[in-house]
Swiss-Prot record:
Is composed of two domains, an unusual N-terminal wHTH motif and a more classical four-helix bundle at its C-terminus, which is domain swapped in the DdrC homodimer. The domain swapping creates an asymmetric dimer exhibiting two distinct DNA binding surfaces corresponding to a high- and a low-affinity DNA binding site. Keywords: Cytoplasm, DNA damage, DNA repair, Stress response. This is DNA damage response protein C. GO terms for biological process: cellular response to desiccation; cellular response to gamma radiation; DNA damage response; DNA repair. The gene is ddrC.
Length: 231
């Protein structure tokens, strides 16, 4: 049984793609309005010569980053259209257009990646709500960083700097799993609610409350883990 060809969809454009994510060079060449031979273009722009099987035997291929580099290096009408698309996409991303994230997620074939994005957004939203609650209740200065440290040590067993170094990320949350993100979101949500219900005010009261919440949740997770191991 022959597998259906893989494609990368960008708006109305459909680009054949190999199993490891390289684009079909003849199609890319047409999309960019490149009239010179593909081999000459590779030499001129210092790109590697690569081949993949797109269903009819080995054919020239190009990576997505190299395709983008060509799109900005060329001055054809087709390349300028790609440049315009890129500028519009960057502007939307900088303005926080969530439809950009949705479109990217839809193109990702991995269900785990989409679940991670949902957990990442939930975690970010919970943290923002916690910080807003802290500000309304007189929190200021170092308390914001201290809250994050307590949460990270509770969920991850280490501080943010260690996590970033070990997992090779610049932003701590980018290196966390879906489960870790959801646990952080839960702790932040419970703390925000507790601050409001107890009417806690000031850094000391807020930190004490957050430590109590974090300790309670940690103990709950540890008990749940012990039950699962026994079962």
């Amino acid at each position: 049984m022959k597998n259906a060809p893989l494609t990368l969809n960008f708006g109305s454009v459909r680009l054949p793609v190999s199993a490891d994510g390289l684009l079909h060079a003849p199609t890319a060449q047409q999309q960019l309005g490149l009239t010179q031979s593909w081999e000459a273009a590779l030499v001129e722009h210092g790109l590697p010569e690569t081949y993949r099987d797109f269903g009819a035997g080995p054919e020239a291929a190009v990576s997505v980053p190299d395709f983008v580099a060509l799109a900005f290096a060329l001055d054809t009408p087709e390349a300028r259209r790609w440049q315009k698309r890129a500028r519009e996409l960057l502007a939307r991303a900088m303005q926080g257009d969530v439809r950009v994230a949705a479109q990217i997620a839809e193109r990702n074939p991995e269900p785990d990646a989409r679940r991670w994005l949902a957990a990442r957004l939930e975690s970010t939203g919970a943290r923002r709500e916690l910080l807003a609650t802290v500000a309304r209740h007189g929190g200021e200065g170092r308390v914001y960083g201290q809250l994050g440290s307590i949460s990270n040590r509770t969920v991850l067993g280490k501080d943010s700097a260690s996590v970033r170094q070990e997992r090779g990320v610049k932003a701590t949350r980018d290196g966390l799993t879906s489960a870790e993100l959801l646990r952080l979101a839960y702790i932040d949500t419970v703390t925000a609610r507790a601050i409001q219900e107890s009417e806690a005010r000031g850094n000391a009261a807020i930190l004490t409350l957050h430590e109590q919440v974090a300790r309670s949740e940690r103990q709950s997770w540890e008990r749940a883990g012990q039950v699962q191991r026994v079962g």
